[in-house]
């Protein structure tokens, strides 16, 4: 994958997250902001999830209260380079914990 393809795929991921949070109808207040290629999800309790792109590595990085994760594209899925878990699974787990209620991105 070249850099422009990586950015296109990351932009698609950012848009999917933003659209799902725009449709959020839970009790918790969850906000999403994109600034300079960094997506920040803010929760009512003040906690945040930070998602950014690492162009030199063609990775997506996820920072949560539980820790940091690095994802490589495998087929059509972003997969953690340590655990093998998918981006969506880890994002849902972190968002659910930080929101205090079930958050689904699917």
Swiss-Prot record:
Signal sequence, renumbered to the chain: none
Keyword annotations: Iron, Metal-binding
InterPro entries: CyaY, Frataxin/CyaY, Frataxin/CyaY_sf, Frataxin_CS
Any Pfam family: Frataxin_Cyay
Organism ancestry: Bacteria, Pseudomonadati, Pseudomonadota, Gammaproteobacteria, Enterobacterales
Family: Belongs to the frataxin family.
GO cellular component, one term: cytosol
One GO BP annotation of this record: iron-sulfur cluster assembly
Primary role: Involved in iron-sulfur (Fe-S) cluster assembly. May act as a regulator of Fe-S biogenesis.
Protein's recorded name: Iron-sulfur cluster assembly protein CyaY
An example Gene Ontology molecular-function term: ferrous iron binding
CDD domains associated with the record: Frataxin
SUPFAM superfamilies per the UniProt record, alphabetical: Frataxin/Nqo15-like
